[in-house]
């Protein structure tokens, strides 16, 4: 005859095995889903300033401000296994001193149940766009890309890049502006 503890242990082990099998089934049903979506990006304003750099030996560095529009339909990205999306807009460019520079300019957490159709107008960069030198001034190829990290209830965390990118030229001169 089995004791009460032995029966409880068997029940717990069986329940754990069933839950693991169900979780694996959940992961397999959504693991290979295409989570990409078309994205439209438009930059409406670029401001470039020369500011004091207190982080290093350089006296001044470039600071860029960008105002942009984002339009994307992320409805097909959501399914029953997606808890939220972490969206972020990044800028990628090259300079003489660095072959690849990447800076996150803006981010947003989009929860399940919120409107997955983005139509954002005149959004200002949320984070500073610093370059450690003067790599932004006159740079003709700063590429903005909207990407997102899918946060599932169970499974892997896929990183998805939107299909729309925009390359913008930065001005050849600095502006003196009090507000942006």
Curated annotation (Swiss-Prot):
**Keywords from the named record:** Endoplasmic reticulum, Glycoprotein, Membrane, Signal-anchor, Transmembrane, Transmembrane helix
| Transmembrane helix among keywords | yes
A single GO BP:
fat cell differentiation
Give the positions annotated as glycosylation sites: 141
Membrane-spanning residues: 12-32
Instruction: Write out the topological domains of type Lumenal.
Output: 33-180
Q: Which InterPro entries match?
A: SPC3
Primary location: endoplasmic reticulum
Record's signal peptide: none
Residues assigned to the Cytoplasmic compartment are 1-11
Instruction: Name the membrane topology term.
Output: Single-pass type II membrane protein
This protein's GO CC annotations = endoplasmic reticulum; signal peptidase complex
Q: What induces it?
A: By the PPARG agonist rosiglitazone.
Tissue specificity is: Strongly expressed in epididymal white and brown adipose tissue with low levels in heart.
Q: Which compartments is it annotated to reside in?
A: Endoplasmic reticulum membrane
Which is one Pfam family of this protein?
A: SPC22
State what this protein does: Plays a role in adipogenesis.
Q: What else is known?
A: Arxes1 and Arxes2 appear to have arisen by retrotransposition of the signal peptidase Spcs3 followed by a segmental duplication event.
User: Member of which family?
Assistant: Belongs to the SPCS3 family.
Q: What is this protein called?
A: Adipocyte-related X-chromosome expressed sequence 1
Upper lineage: Eukaryota, Metazoa, Chordata, Craniata, Vertebrata
- What is this protein's gene name? Arxes1
């Amino acid at each position: 005859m089995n004791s009460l503890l032995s029966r409880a242990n068997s029940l717990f082990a069986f329940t754990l095995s069933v839950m693991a099998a169900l979780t694996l089934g959940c992961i397999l049903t959504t693991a290979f889903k295409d989570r990409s979506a078309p994205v439209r990006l438009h930059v409406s304003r670029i401001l470039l300033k020369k500011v004091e750099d207190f982080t290093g030996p350089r006296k001044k560095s470039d600071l860029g401000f960008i105002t942009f529009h984002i339009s994307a339909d992320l409805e097909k990205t959501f399914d029953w296994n997606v808890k939220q999306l972490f969206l972020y807009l990044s800028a990628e460019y090259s300079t003489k001193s660095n072959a690849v520079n990447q800076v996150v300019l803006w981010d947003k957490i989009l929860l399940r149940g919120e409107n997955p159709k983005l139509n954002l107008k005149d959004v200002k960069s949320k984070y500073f766009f610093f370059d450690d030198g003067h790599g932004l001034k006159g740079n003709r190829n700063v590429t903005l890309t909207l990407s997102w990290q899918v946060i599932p209830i169970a499974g892997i965390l896929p990183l998805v890049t939107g299909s729309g990118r925009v390359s913008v030229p930065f001005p050849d001169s600095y502006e003196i502006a009090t507000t942006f």
